[in-house]
């Protein structure tokens, strides 16, 4: 069977830059699935993406499906014919579905009986006939949140479409996709190269587009070129470019022919906090800031043009003129804001609503102040500094700088607090109160900052759950999942002695009578324990390990973590599976017991050697392990408990638990309950698979 290279390119208006990669990857994944489902043999499926095009190139695509033999078994002969030998309705319906009559069917004899059988040789369809619908289906499945319609057409897509190129080798596959008739025409760069040209063979792509159209269609190659050229440009001025992955991706999605240039701004603007300048350069203008080797911002920036100009100085000058007013605004806001102390903004917080039922930002500030102080007392942080940080925590939201450059909240609070002469850990806390902002983000660096960050997040959790607006499905407008995980990460990774029970109760208490959900404390704790499940699954822990610990509902996060590590280690022991099975058996036996058990195991009632030996082991371990449990040394405790495997096995092999004599039966059930209680001090081992 012959094979050829296949090419599809969809030429569009400028595609959304932040979605470009996902669109291209989804297109490739969807089309690959279509090929596989159709049974079309193929080689590598390569995707290309630039601002005005999505393309796929498939190597070694078979020109048709392979022929195949089809067999369809019908009803058994006994059900296929009536007593007179006439075909039944079931047989006739099956035959119609196969496109034959009953008398044309073959018969299949097996050891289990005889059935009607249809056999056929089906010729594979040509790739040319199959591909148009496969491309259309792949495009229809793209993750596009909002579709566009253009002109008088009813066609919808992410952006208007101008060209559709469909080539199998050197042949155009005729089709109408997204309202456009397929052709071999490709459009080049808007301002360079040939605006439009034809491609003779799919193998010429993307090289022909590079040479004639001045477009680097290979997304990764374009991104790598930007990165390398920007690094070289920064090196030439003695600096290091801030090439964050997200901005690199966005810039690579904005240009088809990247030309990296270096510009500068006035040094006087360096008196403004670097974060505000960087926000302007990266967020608004998509520029790459440049730092010296000490990490200090330089008065330069690197940007990427989408054209190779004969006079790049004009482009540089134009970008410098664009950014200057924004930097001047930042300078003005910074100087204006410093004329007031942070504390002077407190009254204005009363004018901003946090949530209609929960009050204003000033109300939230008062709660955070009290809760941060309480947390500081629990974890050994400076209580006065924590309450001060809580009082000032939202004041920077009222400043000109944060109003204009919203992403600078927190960091500007830190700078203004330093200007006001606040304690350094207070100033740092104002910046770090929102950490961690995302998975893998840094945690607050000092105890005061930890207290403030936890207080802010717990106040939100308690309040929103307290009015019954917990997350539903994918909707989480108050980012409660992120807040809960942030609290857990801080407590666990900083090893803080905080209990979710008392922490949540204190956060709820500070709301007074504003909350309407009587179960708010339990709801918040259950929600946070649920975030533990997601966290530990991401860390690679098995679901049953997590369930075993969750069954005990430990509310101290650091304690939860210790139990997780202990159970995970226990699973590696040779005795683990047998003891897990024994615990499951014990759990089932106790669940069926209807008689009240004794408080203690009565030694005088023990008869069999195996139960006497098990009881002896339990007494020894109970006394030995109490300090382990008290200190959270769960891993050591489970290692000791592993020694119970032999006496437990002996017990179940030689002792009848449900003895006829009531005293003996209840004593043995009590013995098993004491065994289970020891393991439950750590986790419910019976849930391990």
From Swiss-Prot:
PROSITE patterns: AA_TRNA_LIGASE_II_GLYAB. It catalyses: tRNA(Gly) + glycine + ATP = glycyl-tRNA(Gly) + AMP + diphosphate. Keywords: Aminoacyl-tRNA synthetase, ATP-binding, Cytoplasm, Ligase, Nucleotide-binding, Protein biosynthesis. One of its GO terms (biological process) is arginyl-tRNA aminoacylation. It is found in: Cytoplasm. GO terms for molecular function: arginine-tRNA ligase activity; ATP binding; glycine-tRNA ligase activity. It is an enzyme of class 6 (ligase). HAMAP family: Gly_tRNA_synth_beta (MF_00255). Tetramer of two alpha and two beta subunits. Belongs to the class-II aminoacyl-tRNA synthetase family. This is Glycine--tRNA ligase beta subunit. It comes from Salmonella dublin (strain CT_02021853). The gene is glyS.
């Amino acid at each position: 069977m012959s094979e050829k290279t296949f090419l599809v390119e969809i030429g569009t208006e400028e595609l959304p830059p932040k979605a470009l990669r996902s669109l291209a990857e989804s297109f490739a994944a969807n089309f690959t699935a279509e090929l596989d489902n159709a049974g079309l043999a193929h080689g590598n499926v390569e995707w290309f993406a630039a601002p005005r095009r999505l393309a796929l190139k498939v190597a070694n695509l078979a020109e048709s499906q392979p022929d195949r033999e089809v067999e369809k078994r019908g009803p058994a002969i006994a059900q296929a014919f009536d007593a007179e030998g006439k075909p039944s309705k079931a047989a006739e319906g099956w035959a119609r579905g196969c496109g034959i009559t009953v008398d044309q069917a073959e018969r299949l004899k097996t050891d289990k009986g005889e059935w009607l059988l249809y056999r056929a040789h089906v010729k594979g369809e040509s790739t040319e006939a199959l591909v148009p619908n496969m491309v259309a289906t792949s495009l229809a499945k793209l993750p596009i949140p909002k579709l566009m319609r253009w002109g008088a057409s009813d066609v919808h897509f992410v952006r208007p479409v101008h060209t559709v190129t469909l080539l199998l080798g050197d042949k155009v596959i005729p089709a109408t996709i997204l309202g456009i008739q397929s052709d071999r025409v490709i459009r080049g760069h808007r301002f360079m190269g040939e605006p439009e040209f034809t491609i003779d063979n799919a193998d010429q792509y993307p090289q022909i587009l590079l040479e004639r159209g001045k477009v680097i269609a290979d997304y990764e190659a374009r991104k790598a070129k930007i990165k390398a050229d920007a690094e070289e440009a920064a090196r030439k001025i003695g600096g290091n470019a801030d090439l964050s992955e997200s901005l690199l991706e966005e810039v690579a999605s904005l240009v088809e022919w990247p030309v990296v240039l270096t510009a500068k701004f006035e040094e006087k603007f360096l008196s403004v906090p670097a974060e505000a300048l960087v926000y302007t350069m990266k967020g608004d203008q998509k520029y790459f800031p440049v730092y010296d080797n000490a990490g200090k911002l330089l008065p330069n920036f690197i940007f990427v043009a989408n054209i190779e100009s004969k006079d790049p100085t004009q482009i540089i000058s134009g970008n410098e003129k664009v950014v200057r007013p924004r930097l001047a605004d930042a300078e003005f806001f910074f100087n204006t804001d410093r004329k007031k102390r942070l504390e002077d903004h407190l009254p204005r917080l009363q004018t901003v609503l946090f949530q209609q039922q929960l009050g204003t930002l000033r109300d939230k500030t008062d709660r955070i102040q009290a809760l941060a102080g309480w947390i500081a007392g629990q974890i050994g942080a400076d209580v006065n500094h924590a309450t001060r940080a809580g009082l000032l925590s939202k004041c920077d939201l009222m400043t000109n700088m944060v109003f204009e450059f919203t992403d600078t909240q927190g960091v500007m609070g830190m700078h203004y607090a330093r200007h006001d002469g606040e304690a350094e850990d207070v100033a740092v806390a104002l910046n770090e109160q929102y950490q961690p902002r995302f998975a893998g983000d840094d945690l607050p660096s000092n105890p005061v900052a930890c207290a403030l960050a936890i207080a802010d997040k717990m106040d939100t959790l308690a309040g929103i759950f307290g009015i019954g607006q917990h997350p539903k499905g994918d909707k989480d407008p108050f980012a409660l999942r992120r807040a809960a995980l942030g609290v857990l990460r801080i407590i666990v990774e900083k090893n803080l002695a905080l209990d979710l029970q008392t922490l949540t109760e204190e956060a709820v208490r500070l709301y007074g009578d504003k909350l309407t959900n009587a179960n708010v404390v339990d709801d918040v704790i259950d929600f946070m324990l649920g975030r533990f499940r997601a966290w530990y699954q991401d860390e690679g822990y098995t679901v049953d390990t997590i369930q075993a610990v969750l069954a005990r509902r430990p509310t101290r996060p650091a304690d939860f973590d210790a139990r997780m590590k202990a159970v995970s280690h226990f699973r590696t022991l040779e005795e683990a599976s047998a003891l897990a099975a024994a615990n499951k058996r014990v759990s089932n036996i106790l669940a069926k017991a209807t008689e009240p058990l004794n408080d203690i195991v009565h030694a005088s009632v023990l008869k069999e050697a195996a139960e006497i030996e098990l009881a002896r082991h339990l007494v020894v371990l109970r006394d030995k392990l109490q300090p382990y449990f008290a200190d959270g040394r769960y891993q050591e405790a489970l290692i000791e408990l592993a020694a119970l495997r032999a006496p437990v096995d002996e017990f179940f092999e030689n002792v009848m638990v449900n003895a006829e004599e009531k005293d003996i039966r209840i004593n043995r059930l009590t013995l098993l309950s004491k065994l289970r209680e020891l393991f439950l001090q750590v986790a419910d081992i019976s849930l391990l698979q």
